[in-house]
């Protein structure tokens, strides 16, 4: 109880002391605002502290806001210059701003400019004593020299970088910070005891990391050197030690224990024999390929280049072939190795794991592997035809055209079709292959009607409707390759039908190349893009896709014939002109004109849309008039074939 009472008493005394201090500060502030501050501080009264003011009516009375300390002083002393000067001098002394520090430093620098040594020399020459009020006896000894003062200022700036005019720091703050540094320096001796020296000797490192001496070796510790020791730098090699003893000990241990080498069929040879290294690498590749074949539970399917249907290999061990035998290049990946006759790395081929069977696991539709592209390119068509579109080379060309840019199409727009002009027959046989993706099962009970266009020798066209089952029964000149086996109970099973059909069309009677008349109505869907469909939507989508493929095959490879009759209205609504114009030459001239204009050419290669009206004006200025709508349509078709972005809107 006594302890609690003493604590309460001490807290009360502290509170009284704080209140007394606050009262003193308020009294000093009140005296500072009085008019006679500094003159008659003892005789000031409360009456003189508040000067009288003129009586002004309330309407005309308007007080100015006091926004600074000088304005407050002027308002208090009513323009008395002497009092204002005294108060300002007092405010300078009492204010804690940075200007006080600057004044002190400036005063010291002004004194220091008068060199103390010159004054001392003058005193010696004159032999008289200078007034002590101006220069004290110890003048020039207590004050700093200019170099010493510069060092002091720089040390203050380095130790206290936050000392600036904005932070309102004074010399008292510098003193406090300096005392704190001195106090912390006394404490830092305990921190230094826990820190090691900066430079460590080899003995210190050995003790610190618990390293062993060079002579100390444990009997159970074995060091193994791999066949790639020329590449991997061991610790013994880094320390420049002799590794011959270690190698001999390792060989003796292997002979005594009869242990197997690290890799079967690989010899440990020095770096100077590249032939043996290449042999070791080939043996490693064959071992890895055997492991891949043994671990796969799926019977692989490969495409033979001698037959039109895929063949199934029964023995999986045949996939691992020696490197000297020819292997199908589409199912190989290369690995660098050294040749026997040269030190330059050559490409050795090794078989890889073939694609999985769709019966085992069916992946997501949008995540099918990219090897399906190689399957489509590996299908071999009838070799008796002159124009074949199913080779791997042509397939890669058609695939690359899907990713071509506007610049490649604009600069190099050559046709990839080759016609058999050596034979003088009425018609030309062109082999067309379309890949039609089938999604899910095909229900034979549903009746699906497909539309196709057929052209006879006279040039007449007619529309043919066929059912799904009739479509599945192909004529003798068509064949179906199913890759892979699609007989599965899964609802989302996927199979690809590669339909290779023969289309007969008339040979153009006129001379010249009419490949520019190919109607590019739409871009065909990419064959390697699959979209998952429901069972209810498969009927309509399959009808539309097959119809698009058939129309594309018939419209892209038929030239304009002036004697042919107008076709019946189809979904594409083709209306060929009666006049035959060599559009290819016109397209080439337009292309050269557009390339000659740097602004238009830059917009083309940067995929910026051009205004159709400006292109028409540019061509008309160069002699190509377009009075008819069909000329404008021809220009639009030219821009479409060149993959040029344009808009028909007018420039704002």
UniProtKB/Swiss-Prot annotation:
It is found in: Nucleus. One of its GO terms (cellular component) is Slx1-Slx4 complex. Regulatory subunit of the SLX1-SLX4 structure-specific endonuclease that resolves DNA secondary structures generated during DNA repair and recombination. Has endonuclease activity towards branched DNA substrates, introducing single-strand cuts in duplex DNA close to junctions with ss-DNA. Its main location: nucleus. The gene is SLX4. One of its GO terms (biological process) is DNA replication. This is Structure-specific endonuclease subunit SLX4. Forms a heterodimer with SLX1. It comes from Komagataella phaffii (strain GS115 / ATCC 20864) (Yeast). Residues 1-10 have a biased composition (Polar residues). Pfam families: Slx4 (PF09494). The keyword Nucleus applies. Keywords: DNA damage, DNA recombination, DNA repair, Nucleus, Phosphoprotein. Residues 1-23, 37-64, 303-353, 553-574 are annotated as: Disordered.
